[in-house]
Amino acid sequence: MAAKPEDKSTDIPDRLVDINQRKTYKRMRFFGKGGFAKCYEIIDVETDDVFAGKIVSKKLMIKHNQKEKTAQEITIHRSLNHPNIVKFHNYFEDSQNIYIVLELCKKRSMMELHKRRKSITEFECRYYIYQIIQGVKYLHDNRIIHRDLKLGNLFLNDLLHVKIGDFGLATRIEYEGERKKTLCGTPNYIAPEILTKKGHSFEVDIWSIGCVMYTLLVGQPPFETKTLKDTYSKIKKCEYRVPSYLRKPAADMVIAMLQPNPESRPAIGQLLNFEFLKGSKVPMFLPSSCLTMAPRIGSNDTIEDSMHRKPLMEMNGIRPDDTRLESTFLKANLHDAITASAQVCRHSEDYRSDIESLYQQLTNLINGKPRILQGNLGDENTDPAAQPLFWISKWVDYSDKYGFGYQLCDEGIGVMFNDTTKLILLPNQINVHFIDKDGKETYMTTTDYCKSLDKKMKLLSYFKRYMIEHLVKAGANNVNIESDQISRMPHLHSWFRTTCAVVMHLTNGSVQLNFSDHMKLILCPRMSAITYMDQEKNFRTYRFSTIVENGVSKDLYQKIRYAQEKLRKMLEKMFT
């Protein structure tokens, strides 16, 4: 007999009432969970302002002796006010729960950025690290040690501004020279003096920033091993390797922060004087496409550099090299298109490895024999943080004459022509990327492009007009519009039709299946997750491990099996 899906949110009311402030919040979509708390998007019913509602169960809090810790977290966090710290708006309680009203960070945390991208460019790292330092400097100036700085506690808002959050382990230094003795932190980021219990202070945050910076640039934490024992051993010995491809300014800064002796580490304010930050202009913004794809060019790169950069293994895109760009480049009117080397595109082996990984993950899911449920799993089994950033919302097949056209969820338009060349119109409706048969990228605008592409540009306009006028958009609407010149949007790598579905593989690694019954699947190998979109355009994202552990509806299971079979055929084609 099929099992019923569980819904564990019954102890949380739909309306959260703050009697003292005379405010009522409506509980909206589930946002995530961790420790003893669940997080929801909540709306102030009077003002329509949207917040994150962190809801802590009193029953669990008392059971695990977390009452004092929660009180200290609230006391510290409510006293803070800085652009790079998650804003604390309010807190209240009832007989069942404590409700903490926080700034909503819709772009999730830097952990999701890391999973999707592995390594990021130095250009991007400079942007993030500078903001992290600003936030931590504010904390240290106010005698607060965070003690749990890690990618998962560094949140991102819609503008990709860094917001430091989760003050559950934070502490305040009461007097000059005080050393804390509590064993706390996250294994991959914990400082050696915490492990040796010699007493610790502000320097533990510097160590953690070093681990964060290393992870962003290299793609994995510096001391990561398969076991906790080995990781702690490496941390105590300060045993890690700086890859040779890291440029000296970046390597010097990481090495300075990862000093085994806390007294040898720079103070937070001194980090701003390192060449990595001082020698290059810190970017003022990044496009949201950087969450899944490397930027096309950094404003400190030269035109020549953008044409000849070498890819870093496991990096989704590019890494700046030693040379620099005149700051006027991005402002210049590009009369001649800038052609980037095929090296900036991910190689076909990388696309294949994504499909191989996805096929293996689906195979493991099926072999796990998940129980079949009568309906979908409850909201609390979903993982909204793993929801795809880009998917295909419209498509039209004119491959009998011209090619396959599609629109991404952010309003970007793409065409894959029958000769395998591609045109992508960015959401700003100005910038155009052309990708030739060999994978070389050419950057143009709708008014300034190669005359040899005249016919294809007209076809792009035709596809765009048809989809806008005749097709209904699939999926959520809350997607930012890209409007800058450094975006590299994911585009269609390959597609094919079957008797009951259209299968589309994007260059960010995801595979989308649009079924004839109007159900859609988006599979992401990097997040190990599947997103299921029903006829009403409702999104549900599940980790593969959650499905194995908790079960799956019959319809979704059948579609997963179908997707696995199509991935197998894709792999066979790639190897022939």
Curated annotation (Swiss-Prot):
InterPro entries: Kinase-like_dom_sf, POLO_box_1, POLO_box_2, POLO_box_dom, POLO_box_dom_sf, Prot_kinase_dom, Ser/Thr_kinase_AS. It comes from the Eukaryota. Larval disks, brain and testis. One of its GO terms (biological process) is meiotic spindle midzone assembly. It catalyses: L-seryl-[protein] + ATP = O-phospho-L-seryl-[protein] + ADP + H(+); L-threonyl-[protein] + ATP = O-phospho-L-threonyl-[protein] + ADP + H(+). The modification Phosphoserine is found at S299, S306, S327. Residues 391-469, 491-572 form the POLO box domain. The modification Phosphothreonine is found at T182, T186, T302, T323, T328. The active site is at D148. Keywords: ATP-binding, Cytoplasm, Kinase, Nucleotide-binding, Phosphoprotein, Repeat, Serine/threonine-protein kinase, Transferase. Its EC number is 2.7.11.21. It is an enzyme of class 2 (transferase). Belongs to the protein kinase superfamily. Ser/Thr protein kinase family. CDC5/Polo subfamily. May play a role in regulating both nuclear and cytoplasmic aspects of the mitotic cycle. Regulates localization of the augmin complex during mitosis by ensuring its location on mitotic spindles. Also regulates augmin complex localization during male meiosis by promoting its placement at kinetochores while preventing its association with spindle microtubules. PANTHER family: SERINE/THREONINE-PROTEIN KINASE PLK, SERINE_THREONINE-PROTEIN KINASE PLK1. This is Serine/threonine-protein kinase polo. It comes from Drosophila melanogaster (Fruit fly). The gene is polo.
